Amino acid sequence: MDAKTVQVTIDKAVPRWDIFCAVVDNFGDIGVCWRLARQLAAEYNLSVRLWVDQLAPFRALCPTLQECDQQWLEGVDVRHWQGENCTPETSDGAADVVVEGFACNLPAAYIEAMAAREQAPIWFNLEYLTAEPWADEYHSLPSIDAQTGLQKVLFVPGFSAHTGGILRERDVIERRDQWQSHSTYRSLFLKQLNVQCDHNTRLVSLFSYENSALPELLRAMEQFSQKHCVLVPMGRVVASIESYLGESLPLGQAITRGALTVQAIPFLAQAEYDHLLWSCDFNIVRGEDSLVRALWAGKPLLWHIYPQEGEHLIKLQAFLTRYTEGLTPEQAAAVTALWMAWNTQASMVEPWQQALAELPALSRQARSWALLQSGKTDLAAKMVQFCTKLV
């Protein structure tokens, strides 16, 4: 049946949620909103609509997405948000809970529909993830919309008990452990990607913004004593790799220089990207969504934070302070030096070598850190709990 004609009966007794997402940086915003929408529908049996302004980036994460105004995917009512087309007529009235993803500015007509409700909706302004101390103070603070008098609640994802938590499906750790405890899953997955590497090769995933430090990182791997195989989902960083190699890197092709092999793989849907992270020995990730997934993978990682005129380094250091807890001063210094060099586009050779010298300890720490975080209440649960307390 065509997605345009799918009809689903909505139980009016089930709370309705609307999540709005304006795609700013290709995949990060929609990645978070799509995960949140799916989790709310699957784990809490909620009626969820996801409004997205750009379908092309969304389709990269969810290949079954079609080019149409409305469709149902994995229990979520997905709507193409086209400017002010989201009116009371097209949205069947404002929902009980409205999530404004990353201050994306809701359509004026929709806000009017919110104000016209007999019972005001719960209105969340979902912020970006941060480990900065201010998150503890500002999370869940209300503000009043000047035009309508509606209350909007700032919801700040974070790593402490006083923040909004981070996205985590209930079974993600269980699924990860099952995958990593059976080498067959990894072997079959890599075979599907046409990746060939022996057990002595360090497998690295690379999903990054453009970075002038990348050539030095590749050079460090090329000259290292142990072989490295770098798997690169097709995207923005491939051109930089081709410049370093001095030749094109077609999809599926592997090119070897010294101890370094680089292979371009397809851009993966979210579930497959999890499998990539679970399969690799070291993960280089970018933005918010892939960072969180790399954390749940329980493998050593390097994060390329979204650049913001210097402010991102404050955010990066705040996360490093939390992430390196439990490491020795030498181990923490190695992680910090590597991450700072990568995010300031500085020399990478020595930081990479120092980090690899501590890799066994970093592997244990990554695993234990994921376990520690999995014991905390996740973002979707905290949102639902917040709403339940107000009913």
Residue ranges and their predicted role:
Residues E127-P215:
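A nucleotide-sugar donor-handling region in carbohydrate enzymes
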Residues I19-I30, F207-N211, F282:
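Short, glycine-rich nucleotide/cofactor-binding loops
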Residues C21-N45, R49-G149, G235:
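Active-site and donor-binding regions of nucleotide-sugar-utilizing enzymes
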Residues E325-V391:
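C-terminal amphipathic helix plus adjacent low-complexity
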Residues A13-D18:
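Extreme N-terminal starter segment of soluble prokaryotic enzymes
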Residues F27, W34-R38, F267-K315:
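A donor-sugar binding/catalytic signature common to diverse glycosyltransferases
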